[in-house]
Amino acid sequence: MMSVTVETLENLERKVVLSLPWSEINAETDKKLKQTQRRAKIDGFRPGKAPLKMIAQMYGASAQNDVINELVQRRFHDVAVAQELKVAGFPRFEGVEEQDDKESFKVAAIFEVFPEVVIGDLSAQEVEKVTASVGDAEVDQTVEILRKQRTRFNHVEREARNSDRVIIDFEGKIDGEPFAGGASKNYAFVLGAGQMLPEFEAGVVGMKAGESKDVTVNFPEEYHGKDVAGKTAVFTITLNNVSEATLPEVDADFAKALGIADGDVAKMREEVQKNVSREVERRVNEQTKESVMNALLKAVELKAPVALVNEEAARLANEMKQNFVNQGMADAANLDLPLDIFKEQAERRVSLGLILAKLVDENKLEPTEEQVKAVVANFAESYEDPQEVIDWYYAEPSRLQAPTSLAIESNVVDFVLGKAKVNEKALSFDEVMGAQA
C-alpha cells in the first residue's frame, strides 16, 4: 500500500486522501457487470444471454459507483489499521478537485479520532459522599404514606373541611363574560391538596351540599393560562357532595394488603424498612456517583468527538420520543425534536464514557462475575419472584449489559473515593426521598 499522509484539521478532525487505481476500479467494475449479466432479464434475449456491451451501457455507471464506494470503504479501513487511527464515528468522503494522476481516482476521507484521555490528579479533587439512615421514624412516615394511598372517602352531611373530597359545579366569568375552561359539572377534588387556586378552595371550605355562592379569584400573573393570567374572575360554585377521608388502621388487614400473607404487622414493618432502606441506599449512591462523575470531568481536559456527541444526542431524542409514545402519545414518534437541546447532556455522557473506559483499563476495574451477580440480585430483590428475574437476565447475555455497566460504575466510584478528598454529607430521610431518583 502506498504511504498516506494524515492531515490534522480542527480539534480531533483528520483528513487522508485515498488513491484508487483505475485499473482496480475497472477490473472490479467488469467483474460486477459480468455478475449482473448472468442475472439480467432483458427483452429479446434469453435470461443471462444479453451482450456484455449492452449490460455495460445500461448498468455501467451505477456498477462503477458501487465499486468505488466499496473500494473507498475498504481502503479507508486498511489505512486506519496501518496508521493505527482510532476513528470516532463514521468518516465522510468528498471528491478531490485536483485529479492530477490519470492512473488513479482520488477521494478525501474526513473523520474524527478519539482524544487522548489523561486522568489528572484525583487527590486534588473533592467528592461529596452522601449518607442517610432509616429507623423507626422513617418507617412510621412511610407507613403513613401507604395509609394515605389507601384513603377511602365516605359521604358526610356537614360543612366541607380541608382534606375532604368535594364534588362541585362551577362557572367562572371575567368582566361578566364566561371564559374557556372556566366551567365544569360534577368536578371532584380534595380540599387542601392544591389542585385548585387557594382562593377558590377557601371559598368552598365551610359550604354544605346544596349550597351555592360566588367566589372571587385572582389569577396570578404567572398563571399557565395566558388568557386569564393576572385577571380577576368571579366563580359561581354549587357544592353537590362532601366526603370525609378515612385512613385504614394499621392492622392485619392492612398488612395483608401490603403482601404479608399472615397479616403480621411486625413483619410488615420489617418489609417496609427493607424496601425503604434499599431505595434510600440507591438514591444516596446515585448522588455520590454524580459527585464522583463531576470530579472526573474536572480532572480531565477532554474534547468529545462531535460525531459521537451527535450520535448520542440523536439517541437521546429517540429515547424521549419513545417515552412519549409509551405514555400514550402516539404522534410523538413523528416529533422533530431539535438535537441542540440534547447536546449538553450528550457531550457529558460521551466524555464520561471515554474517561471511564480509560480509568477502568488503566486500573483494572472490570467487574467480577460475582459483582455482576450481586447487581442482578439487587434488581430482583424487589420483585415477587426474585429467581424468575435473575433467570431472565441470565437467559440472554445481552441483558447483562446494564448490570455490568452499573458494576463498572460502582468500581469507579469506589476507586475515586479512595483517591479524592471525601466530604461526607448526611441527609435527612425527607431530603433523600425528595431528591430526583
From Swiss-Prot:
Enzyme Commission numbers on file: 5.2.1.8
PROSITE patterns, per the entry: FKBP_PPIASE (PS50059)
Catalysed reactions, semicolon-separated: [protein]-peptidylproline (omega=180) = [protein]-peptidylproline (omega=0)
EC class: isomerase
Keyword Ribonucleoprotein part of the UniProt annotation: no
GO molecular function, one term: peptidyl-prolyl cis-trans isomerase activity
Any one annotated GO CC term: cytoplasm
SUPFAM superfamilies noted in UniProt: FKBP-like, Triger factor/SurA peptide-binding domain-like, Trigger factor ribosome-binding domain
UniProtKB keywords: Cell cycle, Cell division, Chaperone, Cytoplasm, Isomerase, Rotamase
GO terms (BP aspect): 'de novo' cotranslational protein folding; cell division; chaperone-mediated protein folding; protein transport; protein unfolding
Main subcellular localisation: cytoplasm
InterPro entries cross-referenced by the UniProt entry: PPIase_dom_sf (IPR046357), PPIase_FKBP_dom (IPR001179), Trig_fac (IPR005215), Trigger_fac_C (IPR008880), Trigger_fac_C_sf (IPR037041), Trigger_fac_ribosome-bd_bac (IPR008881), Trigger_fac_ribosome-bd_sf (IPR036611), Trigger_fact/SurA_dom_sf (IPR027304)
Subcellular location, record wording: Cytoplasm
Domain notes: Consists of 3 domains; the N-terminus binds the ribosome, the middle domain has PPIase activity, while the C-terminus has intrinsic chaperone activity on its own.
Known function: Involved in protein export. Acts as a chaperone by maintaining the newly synthesized protein in an open conformation. Functions as a peptidyl-prolyl cis-trans isomerase.
Family that this chain belongs to: Belongs to the FKBP-type PPIase family. Tig subfamily.
PANTHER family xref list: TRIGGER FACTOR CHAPERONE AND PEPTIDYL-PROLYL CIS/TRANS ISOMERASE, TRIGGER FACTOR-LIKE PROTEIN TIG, CHLOROPLASTIC
The protein, known as: Trigger factor
Lineage: Bacteria, Pseudomonadati, Pseudomonadota, Betaproteobacteria, Neisseriales
